[in-house]
Amino acid sequence: MLSLQTLAKKAVAKQSVPEEYHYILKYCGLWWQNKPISLCHYCNYIILNSTLFKRELLHLDVALIMAIKENNYDVIRLFTEWGANIYYGLTCARTEQTQELCRELGAKDGLNNKEIFIGLLRHKTSNNIILCHEIFNNNPILETLNIQDFGEEIHRELKFFIFYILDNVPINVLVKYWYAIAIKYKLKRAISFFYQTYGHLNMWRLMCAIYFNNIFDLHEIYEQKIAHMDIDEMMQLACMRDYNFSTIYYCFVLGGDIDQAINVSQWHHQTNNICFCKDLKDLKQNVLTARPLLLPNITDPKKIYTMLKNYLPTSSNSR
């Protein structure tokens, strides 16, 4: 059961406190990263207002790991009292005093890197991906990280796309992997987190959106001019993975070479993409007879998703 003091702090953290009273928040321990600690009214999330993150929601479990890496004992206790999971704390504790505090609060001893990595990503959620990132990133305890330990899991998720993340620095591989998983599973908060944290990986975000058929993220990248790639290169990337109808269609509408798309799909033996690209070629030549009909020149991702959700290429039906 939470103490009266803990409940009171939690209640205050959910209020909007005028700046002239911030000194009271500091005195009460409701202060972190030079800002008041703000707690979401309806969920277990901290509202970040740092220079990097503007009004960004961060799960208490993630915030706790960040506090542990900072050796911020008061905040560690506070977040744990509020319900944050201390389970992975010892993996990130950098001093003996922090380690002892984590043990006292219930952290698990003896976890290995693979257990953490596989365990967290068994359920693909924004919180788990960001938490995994915070545990492994900038953590001197994990300097001996061996990327081969995670190779099977990474290959299972990325398949052919794994060749695009090869790097001599293990953490660079993992960051690209987490970003790719966020895009593959359309995890908006995780995508936002990586976009704000790793601005130099905007091209990687574009490539992942295309390859993993995330039409919503692709449209956002294109509309906001976050990254740019030659349209035919985009089309080639879309055709490398079967059933990428949405991103193939989007590239087609933007002017991608449909004959080249057919050739790339054939080269990669993506049968359904071949049939779909042939339908798009028929659409371009106004000879398409499939039902439901493909519509030309749509760039709204919701309309594209609805149009193609149950779409079967004409050529595959005629086999």
Curated annotation (Swiss-Prot):
Pfam families: ASFV_360. GO terms for biological process: taxis. Keywords: Early protein. It comes from the Viruses. The keyword ATP-binding does not apply. Induction: Expressed in the early phase of the viral replicative cycle. Plays a role in virus cell tropism, and may be required for efficient virus replication in macrophages. Belongs to the asfivirus MGF 360 family. This is Protein MGF 360-8L.
